[in-house]
Design a protein with these regions (language model features):
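Terminal amphipathic alpha-helical/low-complexity segments used for targeting or macromolecular assembly
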Residues: 1-164
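A structural motif detector for beta-strand N-caps
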Residues: 153, 159, 167-179, 187, ...
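Hydrophobic, aromatic-lined core segments that form the binding pocket/scaffold
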Residues: 183
């Protein structure tokens, strides 16, 4: 199945970030929007190929998608959440998932049936400043994904920290002589 991330007409309003990449390739939280979808698709065993509906000049680097009967078109400005992914994967050909009149996803070339989402944990960006205003929620969402069923490395004694339960150090990552302040949100340190 081809999964197509659509800029949803937001290319200009998310500039300058979208001048060199499609909307779904914006880092929103720890991961890009596309990476958050990839995590859940892999978790559900979905066999897919990624493509984009974006500005033509970006197609040299980012594969252009073609809407077909079995393709899944996803608004590239919405980060994947468990409830949203469940609704998107349940779409049948000709169905579209909407929130407040805005299309979140559609299965196939056209939308014949509109379904309103029941997902309450939606994370989206429509303007460039939303990346910063809503980043805390996106980081928390990604932190849960990246640390689920995993054990953090022990922080060495050369470091100082507070709220160690909000600090995760991935295997292979090194942190020395640092002050880690996790009092207002989680800290994820990936492998070097």
């Amino acid at each position: 199945m081809q999964v197509i991330f659509d800029d949803n007409g937001l290319h200009k309003s998310l500039a300058p970030f979208t001048l060199t990449r499609p909307v779904a390739e914006i880092r929103f939280g720890i991961m890009t929007i596309r990476e958050s979808w990839a995590y859940y698709f892999d978790l559900h065993g979905v066999d897919y190929e990624t493509a984009y509906l974006t500005k033509d000049y970006l197609n040299a680097k980012f594969k252009k998608g073609n809407l077909e009967d079995d393709s899944l078109n996803i608004a590239g400005n919405y980060k994947a959440t468990p409830s949203l992914v469940k609704e998107v994967l349940a779409l049948k050909k000709g169905e579209g998932l909407f929130v407040n009149g805005v299309r979140l996803a559609q299965k196939g070339q056209t939308v014949e049936t509109e379904i309103n989402t029941t997902a309450e944990d939606l994370l989206s960006i429509e303007k460039s400043w939303h990346i910063f205003q809503r980043n805390d929620k996106a980081v928390e969402s990604d932190f849960e994904i990246l640390t689920s069923n995993k054990t953090s490395q022990v922080l060495s004694e050369t470091n100082r920290s507070n709220n160690p339960e909000n600090i995760f150090i991935a295997e292979g990552a090194k942190v020395e002589h640092a002050i880690l302040n996790a009092s207002t949100g989680p800290i994820y340190i990936g492998k070097d």
